[in-house]
């Protein structure tokens, strides 16, 4: 299956194909001339897939080097970026060479940031191996690293030259790592794709059901993301819809300590919290929050977080990228499959946290 992100200046394809990881070299050869490629990955994904990807690339005529960093959100920072820069310089990477991100969302975000800033930008490809990365973070060109103040506070827009998704990589994910990706999938059904929501409603929520329907889940999720990105590449309008649950979700990740609450888990909690407050204010229909809770809990996603420190969460929210002056843009779902922006004074955000 293939989708095209038809941006005017940087169009690229998303290829979804089981077993495609072993064909990485042939795929890259269609996109890039023979050159040096730096594979950026973490130590866990590297142990699983580095050899397969590296061998395929070298058989296709590419010279490869590998930069690995410790697995986890705690590594997504400027210290790791500087280590990557040093590695690239020492290995003679030039502007005519390229970077491949092999891994989950942390790897993709960090590798994309490195690619977009090293020598003012070099070629970049995404090979996402987690569900969260396959349905969300590998598409759309957002890169970024965390700071002590906020998640993804330092970042760029850097569209990849292509995205290769092998659903078979999901089989090696731990249960928690697979399930957290469903937070983003549930979001897509809520904000845009009623058919996807109804399909999810029919699944029993087990790991087996997710893996069995992975191709469908990935394709439909990518199609929502693709459509929104093409309409609003730089996040000034409808792309904000993709942030449903993320405003509070990012604050939870930051205040809990990066890596303690996984991204998709935080998104699920954020969607429930925003919906509960919006429903109380008449901005979302009665019963919507209950539907979201039921769907999240079926797949094993959390819907609450403890401790719930309102002051810490609010302080983190003041650094959110959707904050404009003394207001913040919240995404709500006035009806299933339809999102909207609700702009409120920043201080009113306290009410959304206290419900």
Swiss-Prot record:
Binding site for Zn(2+): 184, 246, 263
Keyword presence, Lipid metabolism: no
Group of enzyme by EC: lyase
Keyword field contains Transcription: no
InterPro entries listed in its UniProt record: Dehydroquinate_synthase (IPR050071), DHQ_synth_AroB (IPR016037), DHQ_synth_fam (IPR030963), DHQS/DOIS_N (IPR030960), DHQS_C (IPR056179)
EC number in record: 4.2.3.4
Cellular compartment(s): Cytoplasm
Cofactor (UniProt): Co(2+); Zn(2+); NAD(+)
Family: Belongs to the sugar phosphate cyclases superfamily. Dehydroquinate synthase family.
Described function: Catalyzes the conversion of 3-deoxy-D-arabino-heptulosonate 7-phosphate (DAHP) to dehydroquinate (DHQ).
Protein name: 3-dehydroquinate synthase
Biological classification of the source: Bacteria, Bacillati, Bacillota, Bacilli, Lactobacillales
